[in-house]
């Protein structure tokens, strides 16, 4: 029982689409990201967080979730080509960097993702 009168939000009781993406970006927080990542079998490292924060900033700046191509080009400009290439991003997010990072970041699925 919650005795401090705070509403506890967990992934289960938040509104999501059929694939598990949050419907309301304002519901996202760091703890929720960790919970979603755990469900995706990902242990978040500092590089995961760089990508997650990057896609959130991108979404709120341009009002669109970056596609894979857009993600790679944009993140390489900001973080550097040597590290954030497609091979490395797939190691971080094996089910697809744009798709999986967006889900963990609490933003909509990229339009071009199947």
Curated annotation (Swiss-Prot):
GO cellular component: cytoplasm
Single GO biological process annotation from the record: tRNA wobble position uridine thiolation
EC number: 2.8.1.-
InterPro entries: DsrC-like_C, DsrC-like_dom_sf, DsrC-like_N, DsrC/TusE
Keywords: Cytoplasm, Transferase, tRNA processing
GO function terms (MF aspect): sulfur carrier activity; transferase activity
Pfam families: DsrC (PF04358)
Ranges annotated as spanning the membrane: none
Broad class of where this protein is predominantly found: cytoplasm
Subcellular location: Cytoplasm
Keyword Cytoplasm: yes
PANTHER family found in the cross-reference section: SULFURTRANSFERASE TUSE
Subunit structure and binding partners: Interacts with the TusBCD complex. Interacts with MnmA.
Primary role: Part of a sulfur-relay system required for 2-thiolation of 5-methylaminomethyl-2-thiouridine (mnm(5)s(2)U) at tRNA wobble positions. Could accept sulfur from TusD.
Protein name: Sulfurtransferase TusE
Species in which this protein is naturally found: Buchnera aphidicola subsp. Acyrthosiphon pisum (strain APS) (Acyrthosiphon pisum symbiotic bacterium)
Organism taxonomic ancestry: Bacteria, Pseudomonadati, Pseudomonadota, Gammaproteobacteria, Enterobacterales
Gene name of this polypeptide: tusE
């Amino acid at each position: 029982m919650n005795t401090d009168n705070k509403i506890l939000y967990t992934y289960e009781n938040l509104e999501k689409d059929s694939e598990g993406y949050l419907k309301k970006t304002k519901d996202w927080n760091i703890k929720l990201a960790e919970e979603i990542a755990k469900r995706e079998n990902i242990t978040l490292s500092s590089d995961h967080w760089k990508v997650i924060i990057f896609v959130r900033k991108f979404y709120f700046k341009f009002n669109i979730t970056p596609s894979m191509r857009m993600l790679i080009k944009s993140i390489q400009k900001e973080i550097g080509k040597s590290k954030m290439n497609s091979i490395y991003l797939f190691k971080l997010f094996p089910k697809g960097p744009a798709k999986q990072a967006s889900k963990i970041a609490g933003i909509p699925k990229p339009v071009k993702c199947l």
